Amino acid sequence: MHELGIMIHIVEKVSALAEQNKLQEIQSLVLQVGELSPVVPHFLEACYPAAVDGTILEKTELKIEVLKASARCLQCDTIYPPVEHKTCPNCNSKELTIVGGREFLIKEIIGY
């Protein structure tokens, strides 16, 4: 489970941002995780309490938004969800490029 290491890194980055901006408390942290990302949202949530223990984020609410995957057909340029359609729903081509769903981002930090 590499999510613990990832979450510790996020906590360090957010803590540094809080210090730079002279924040006393972080109320919420919003992450975006693409459904094709190797990061598993459930595991991030499970290790979050251990990662924030004793930090400025200890009382912070974690929110995780899962971003749907999207692909572009290389034959007709149709954008479609590759998890739901193994071929292009417009032309049945199997040639595609992934254009979304691999993201892993800190979307929002709310604090004061």
Language-model regions: role of each:
Residues 67-69, 84, 102:
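Short metal-coordination and nucleic-acid-contact micro-motifs, chiefly zinc-binding Cys/His arrays
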Residues 92-112:
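Short microdomains enriched in Cys/His and/or Lys/Arg
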Residues 81, 85-89:
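Compact Cys/His-rich metal-coordination microdomains
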Residues 58-64, 72-79:
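Short, intrinsically disordered, charge-biased short linear motifs at domain edges
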Residues 79-81, 96-97:
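Short functional micro-motifs and their immediate structural scaffolds
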Residues 1-58, 63:
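Long, charged N-terminal interaction/targeting segments
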Residues 17-21, 90-97:
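Short aromatic-glycine motifs in intrinsically disordered, low-complexity regions
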Residues 72-73, 88-91:
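Short cysteine-rich clusters marking metal-coordination/redox-active sites
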